[in-house]
């Protein structure tokens, strides 16, 4: 094998002074149409995580829900042993699921993640959602302010270097900031061309809370989108023309645009060439007029709508008029690892 292509990913400084790489590797494999967890891309993803670290990625985004913490832990251990990377060079994020929203359970969840990852601390732990429910899917109505107290506690204990949130709306963030000692460093949300989240980004910027985008391509990739999904697709002529000008792909243009907005992105892929492609966005700059053209694609279209949760307390999104449904079993309780045999 020849010299491996290397990517150089810059960092943003969080409100606690810690550096967080501007682009990370996202490790959520997703659910199948029947609501079960999708293991089909598992082996490819494990290979890609390893490859990503080899070529220069330092930021890995995972969660208890993703089931893959044990494998990530094995990869990290091997890369450190092989001298590819030092622990302090890595930025590892995990998340606490809404079934662990009590003050006692937050620490239980994080310690479980640390055990699976083989680490004594993560760089960031997030409250995955502002809601809370039992493993039977029953609303626990726990105030996220109480949950956040436990996040401040695990921070004090040194189990994590920073604490943040995910899927919180502006009102929830305002209330959290007003009633806590430690401000979240990040809010990780769905954000892409069609769903630009301007109000949320403006508020977070005013508070020095960094926005992190999961689903940075939204519904642009037809195979991953609902048939009636709105917003631009990969073959949009405007996007294709801008990509051609810079000799880049449309995905690179989208990721570059989000980077120029100051947003950290977590593109997910199980294709090695895309691992490199996604991070090869730091060698060119979109002009102001191109930036403005890309901003016009924002039609406030949310592609991820977990309507099965919309009657839970603290559900963060707008509600849709759909028949009531229950939380998929795969999001109530699970075992971890490829063989689903690790607590």
Placement of each model-derived feature along the sequence:
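N-terminal binding-site loop/beta-alpha segment at the start of enzyme catalytic domains
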Residues: 1-90, 217-220, 322-343
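Acidic (Asp/Glu)-rich catalytic clusters
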Residues: 14-15, 73-87, 114-120, 177-180, ...
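CE4/NodB-like, metal-dependent polysaccharide N-deacetylase domain
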Residues: 106-126, 153-157
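Short, acidic/polar
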Residues: 37-53, 102-116, 171-173
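A short, structured active-site edge motif that brings together acidic residues
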Residues: 86-100, 124-130, 190-191
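Beta/alpha (TIM)-barrel catalytic core signal, keyed to glycine-rich beta->alpha loops juxtaposed to Asp/Glu
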Residues: 8, 98, 129-343
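Acidic-and-aromatic substrate-binding clefts and catalytic sites of carbohydrate-active enzymes
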Residues: 31-34, 63-71, 99-104, 133-134, ...
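Glycine-rich phosphate-binding "P-loop"
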Residues: 24-40, 124, 129-141
């Amino acid at each position: 094998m020849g010299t491996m292509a290397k990517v150089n990913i810059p960092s943003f400084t969080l409100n606690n002074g810690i550096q967080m790489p501007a682009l990370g590797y996202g490790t959520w494999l997703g659910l199948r149409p029947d609501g079960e967890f999708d293991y089909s891309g598992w082996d490819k993803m494990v290979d890609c995580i390893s490859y990503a670290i080899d070529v220069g990625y330092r930021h890995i985004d995972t969660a208890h829900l993703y089931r893959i913490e044990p494998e990530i832990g094995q990869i990290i251990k091997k890369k450190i042993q092989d001298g590819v990377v030092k622990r302090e060079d890595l930025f590892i994020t995990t998340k606490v699921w809404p079934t662990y929203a009590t003050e006692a359970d937050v620490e239980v969840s994080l310690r479980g993640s640390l055990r699976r990852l083989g680490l004594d601390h993560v760089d960031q732990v997030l409250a995955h959602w502002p809601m809370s429910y039992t493993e039977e899917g029953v609303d626990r109505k726990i105030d996220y302010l109480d949950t956040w107290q436990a996040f401040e506690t695990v921070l004090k204990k040194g189990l994590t270097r920073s604490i943040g949130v995910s899927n919180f709306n502006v009102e929830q963030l305002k209330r959290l900031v007003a009633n806590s000692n430690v401000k979240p460093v990040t809010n990780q949300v769905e954000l892409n061309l069609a769903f630009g989240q301007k109000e949320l980004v403006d508020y977070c910027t005013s508070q020095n809370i960094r926005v992190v985008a999961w689903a940075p391509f939204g519904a642009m990739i037809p195979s991953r989108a609902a048939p009636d999904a709105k917003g631009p697709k990969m073959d949009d002529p405007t996007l294709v023309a801008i990509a051609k000008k810079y000799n880049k792909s449309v995905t690179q243009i989208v990721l570059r645009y989000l980077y120029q907005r100051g947003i950290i992105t977590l593109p997910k892929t199980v294709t090695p060439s895309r691992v490199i492609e996604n991070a090869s966005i730091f060698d060119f700059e979109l002009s102001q007029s191109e930036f403005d053209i890309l901003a016009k694609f924002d039609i406030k279209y949310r592609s991820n709508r977990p309507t099965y949760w919309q009657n839970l307390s603290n559900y963060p999104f707008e509600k849709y008029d759909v028949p009531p449904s229950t939380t998929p079993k795969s999001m109530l309780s699970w075992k971890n690892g490829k063989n689903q045999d690790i607590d």
